């Protein structure tokens, strides 16, 4: 009887393991199927937009420049990162004029390609720069075997130091910078602005994370104790819902203007590319924008909120009263990824903001 029971239990466990493996295999196969389908959708819609754009007025500033980050990126082997650089009208080695560079910094789980639509609204005279942090986007693709020496390198402070080193490496000493950061990238931009001092002429913060709620802090504590494999499985299950997965819906508003399905599909693909280990390590070292003792630079600061953003809102501007700065607050009807939903509106906000405060030509 004893051996019979053990035999049945062993069989039950074996069938359970086989069943679990079967389900997991199905999930991965379906995930790959969705990825191919969404990639095809994104390409088809992009081709359609490019075809229609040929009939638009040449005076439409939204089509002054065509940008393809995935094809035109370069590698900085010293720091093992991929970057995109469009020099603009003034060569970067020009010593007779101060070069002004727009620097785009992506957020947690993001990549520089998320700025492509916004960048396309900038005229050819503007110098544009962005790069993917270690283990993100094209940097991960170009350096797949890179090992991070210390988790401190992936904290907000570590990524800020990396950003500063990359800028110092690629640009001359007289270069001036306009920093544009999204979400976590907004916090990094604010830290880098302090390192650049007077060389940072403007700071533009898109959907910044101002403060952590007690619920968010509890979630981070739980994730710290959760094995990466379980987090990856949760992400896989979430992606099973396709365009309605929570990782997509929490980042975008319900009523996206334009081709909403293409935007959702592209965001789903970017989320899939995000490495769980890198994402978790960055999250564990994530700082709030308004850290105690932090002081913003004296340059003009634009803080752009999304009306339907669950991460931050215009109401959060009350937190800035204890942090002196030359602020301009703006809200548009988007979710957390404002530059994906309404790139033209984000560009217009940047353009009008710089026109208001600038005494020089920003080439925008």
Curated annotation (Swiss-Prot):
One of its GO terms (cellular component) is lipid droplet. Residues 1-8 are cytoplasmic. The keyword DNA-binding does not apply. It is a single-pass type II membrane protein. Keywords: Endoplasmic reticulum, Glycoprotein, Hydrolase, Membrane, Signal-anchor, Transmembrane, Transmembrane helix. Its main location: endoplasmic reticulum. Glycans are attached at residue 326. GO terms for molecular function: triacylglycerol lipase activity. The chain crosses the membrane at residues 9-29. Gene3D superfamilies: alpha/beta hydrolase (3.40.50.1820). It holds the Pfam family Abhydrolase_1. The active site is at residues 183, 336. Its EC number is 3.-.-.-. It is found in: Endoplasmic reticulum membrane. GO terms for biological process: triglyceride catabolic process. Residues 30-364 are lumenal. The keyword Cell membrane does not apply. Belongs to the AB hydrolase superfamily. This is Abhydrolase domain-containing protein C57A10.08c. It comes from Schizosaccharomyces pombe (strain 972 / ATCC 24843). The lineage of its organism: Eukaryota, Fungi, Dikarya, Ascomycota, Taphrinomycotina.
């Amino acid at each position: 009887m004893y051996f019979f029971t053990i035999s049945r239990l062993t069989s039950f466990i074996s069938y359970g393991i086989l069943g679990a493996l079967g389900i997991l295999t199905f999930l991965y196969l379906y995930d790959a199927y969705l990825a191919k389908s969404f990639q095809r959708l994104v390409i088809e819609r992009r081709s359609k937009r490019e075809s229609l754009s040929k009939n638009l007025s040449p005076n439409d500033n939204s089509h002054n420049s065509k940008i393809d980050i995935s094809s035109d990126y370069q590698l900085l082997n010293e720091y093992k990162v991929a970057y995109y650089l469009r020099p603009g009208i003034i060569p970067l080695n020009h010593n007779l004029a101060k070069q002004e560079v727009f620097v785009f910094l992506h957020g947690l789980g993001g990549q520089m390609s998320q700025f492509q639509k916004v960048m396309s609204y900038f005229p050819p005279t503007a110098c544009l720069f962005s790069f993917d942090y270690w283990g993100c986007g094209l940097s991960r693709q170009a350096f797949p075997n890179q090992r991070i020496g210390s988790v401190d390198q992936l904290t907000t402070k570590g990524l800020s130091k990396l950003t500063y080193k990359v800028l110092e490496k690629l640009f001359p000493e007289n270069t001036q910078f306009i920093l544009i950061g999204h979400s976590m990238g907004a916090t990094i931009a604010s830290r880098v602005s302090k390192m650049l001092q007077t060389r940072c002429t403007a700071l533009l913060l898109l959907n910044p994370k101002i403060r952590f709620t007690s619920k968010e802090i509890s979630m981070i504590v739980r994730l710290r104790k959760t094995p990466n494999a379980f987090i990856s499985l949760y992400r896989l299950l979430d992606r099973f819902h396709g365009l309605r997965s929570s990782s997509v819906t929490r980042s975008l508003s319900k009523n996206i203007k334009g081709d909403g399905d293409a935007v959702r599909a592209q965001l789903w693909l970017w989320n899939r590319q995000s490495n769980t280990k890198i994402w978790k390590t960055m999250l564990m070292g994530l700082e709030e924008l308004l850290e105690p003792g932090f002081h913003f630079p004296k340059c003009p600061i634009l803080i752009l909120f999304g009306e339907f953003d669950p991460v931050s809102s215009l109401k959060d501007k009350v937190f800035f009263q204890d942090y002196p700065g030359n602020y301009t607050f703006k809200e548009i009807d988007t979710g957390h990824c404002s530059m994906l939903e309404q790139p033209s509106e984000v560009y217009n906000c940047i353009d009008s903001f710089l026109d208001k405060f600038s005494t020089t030509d920003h080439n925008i």
